[in-house]
Every structure is written in C-alpha cells, then in structure tokens.
Amino acid sequence: MSRVSRAGVLAAYRDGVTVICELAAQFSDAAWLAVTPCSEWRAADLAGHLRCVADDYHEYLDDAPASRLARLLATNVSADSLARKLARQNAAELAALPDVPGPEHIAAFAESARAYGRRLPPSWDLLHHTYRGSEVTVGAMAGAACAEWHLHAWDLARSLGKDYRPADPELVLAAWQGGTPQLWAGLPVEPGRDDPWYVLLLASGRDPAWVQL
C-alpha cells in the first residue's frame, strides 16, 4: 500500500474513465450487442452498469459514513453474501434505467464519474465506511472505484476482441486492495503468479483467458 499516493490514484482514476470512453467509441451498433466477460451482460448492459455505479458512488459519498453501503458493510457480511446482495442491486438499477443506446449510457457515466473525481480531494481522509474493524476512507474507496473502471475497461476491450492493461497495474491492484478489505481476507495466491493485473483479474472474478468468440 505504500505505493499508493493520492496523486497516483487520482491520475489512474481519470485514466480509467478516459480509456472506457475511448473503447466505447470503437463499438458499432451491432457490437453493443456483443457478450462481455461479465457473462450476464452484453456490452450495452455494461455501459448501463457503469452509469449506475458512478451515480452510486456519489450517493455513498453524500451519505458517508452512514450510506446504505456503509450500513451493509457494518454488519460484517461475508464477501460471498455481499457479492450476491450487490449483484441484486446492480440488476435492479440496470432494469430501472431508460432504454437508450450504449453511447448515451457511456456519456452519462463519464459526466458522473468525472464529477465524482472532482469531489474526492476535499474529502480524501474522511471515513467512508467500516468493515470488520477496518476503516475505509474516501480516498481508499476512490482506489476501489479506480480499479473498477480499469477492470470494466478490460471487459469492454475483450468484448471488442482486444486486450487492455492499465499503465500501472501494481498501483491499481494496491488501490483496490485498500478500498475492498472484504475481498482479500484469506484470498489464496496462485503459485507462480506475480503479475498484479492477473491477480486483480482473478480476484475480481474474471477469467484472464476469456476471449470473444
């Protein structure tokens, strides 16, 4: 975690938003219907999910440290149970979105995500939530958001038949670890795998070998 600086996380956060927009611009109308590594979502669904998540981050910051996410994590819910609850939340939020094309969702995501990024510096050291005795600050949660953008950039790239890797995967991994302590307790390390991007893809439930067929 010593590698993670405020400036580094904020720069990587902005890069994640930018690369999502760059990748989204490469999708044709037909390509938005393609499957993604997020097996339940096509590319257009993933665009909608990004829009929802960016808005959720605003809500969590508005209500910190008593947001609905903070209240859930304060119950010390297991990682598996948390994943199921968030999956249901994601599905409900996606279903409630207007039926618009993928580019419109991406534009809304970019506006919301960049606005969230501008809100982070003044609140950096404030408490965002607590999980099993670990206090997660707004800055640490920014690291989790940063990693989420880069992970979803990889999802979009793979849906296009391409690959993606952040410029500083070690920083992105460390940032995500700081913001998601619920995911790392007891996580086994695969022998011989010291690539931080590979580790993050696996830890986030992705198959690094996934390809668009």
For the regions a language model picked out, list residue spans one by one.
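A short small-residue
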Residues: 89-97
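Short amphipathic alpha-helical/adjacent loop interface patches that line ligand
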Residues: 17, 50, 54, 113
